Amino acid sequence: MGEKDIPRNLKEEEEEEEENQSEETKSLISSLPSDIDCSGTKLYKYQGCWYDKDILQAILNFNKNFQPQETDIIVASFPKSGTTWLKALTFALAQRSKHTSDNHPLLTHNPHELVPYLELDLYLKSSKPDLTKLPSSSPRLFSTHMSFDALKVPLKESPCKIVYVCRNVKDVLVSLWCFENSMSGENNLSLEALFESLCSGVNLCGPLWENVLGYWRGSLEDPKHVLFLRYEELKTEPRVQIKRLAEFLDCPFTKEEEDSGGVDKILELCSLRNLSGLEINKTGSLSEGVSFKSFFRKGEVGDWKSYMTPEMENKIDMIVEEKLQGSGLKL
C-alpha cells in the first residue's frame, strides 16, 4: 500500500474533506479479511496481523502522519511477552543521564506511561498527536504491538532503533488469559477458548508467529537497527542482556558505571518485584481505567505448566514448530 492509499482519521481535518476520507477508511476496512476472535470482537487483517477497527484506524493514522527522528527508540512485542519490563529497562537505560535514583520517574510512573503505545495510545486518541509532550525526549521512546511490516511504513530509511522481545508461546498464552480476565473483573474467558484462538492465529495482533517472525527477520536483515531479545534470557542472564541492550541503544555502560554498580542498580530499579511493590503500581491506573497492578503477575518462566494439559502443550508446540520452520528461530 502506497502513502496515497492510506486513509486518515479526519477529526482535525476540514469539514468538506471529512466525509470523503471517512468513506475511504470504510472502503479499506470493508476490503480486508475479517474474522471474530474468542471474545466476540471483529478483527481485520492488515499487513499480516489482526486488529480491531479502532486499533486499525490508529495504525493508519500512524502510517500516514508519524515523522520519525533519528534517535527514536521503539519497544515492540506481542502482548504479554515481557513488554512492561522491557519498557522499564529501555527507559532507565536511555534516560539514565537525566535522572538520579532518588527521583527516578519509574518510582512515580508506570512504565506504560513513560513509554506510550503508538497504536493503543497516541494515534488512537488523535490522528496527529502532540509528540512534543512525551515523557522522554532525545531519544523519544515509543512502544507497539503492531507487525513489523505495519511499523516500518512511515519509518522508511530512518535509523531509529527497534527493540523486540519474544517469550515462550505457552507462557504468553497463560499471561494473556490472566490479564484478559483481570481486565473484565470476571473469569469469563476460558483458557481453552483463548488457546484455540491463539492456535488459529485469529487474535488481536496475531498470529503470534507472524508478529514474532517479522521482527526476527528484521533483526537478521538489519541488526544495527533491530534488536531481538528473549524474555527467558533476560531472566537467566540479566546483566549480559542489559549490557547488550545498552550497547544497541548507543548508550553503553562506562567502566566507572560498571565498577560503581550501575548495571545492578538499573536491574533492581526495573525488577518486577520492585516495580510491583511501588505505590503507583498498586493503586494507579491508565486514563482508560486499566489498573497498573494488572500488568504485574508472576513473571516466571514455565508458569504455563500449572495450567495447560499435555494435549494443549503438544498441539501448540507442533503448530509453532511448523510455522517457524526454516526461519532459524525457536520459541
From Swiss-Prot:
GO molecular function ontology, one term from the record: sulfotransferase activity
The alphabetical list of record keywords is: Cytoplasm, Transferase
Q: Where in the cell is it found?
A: Cytoplasm
The kind of enzyme this is, by top-level EC class, is transferase
Report biased composition (Acidic residues) as residue ranges.
12-22
Q: Name one GO cellular component term.
A: cytoplasm
Sequence intervals crossing the membrane: none
Protein name according to UniProt: Cytosolic sulfotransferase 8
Q: Which organism is it from?
A: Arabidopsis thaliana (Mouse-ear cress)
Where is the organism placed in the taxonomic lineage, from the top?
Eukaryota, Viridiplantae, Streptophyta, Embryophyta, Tracheophyta
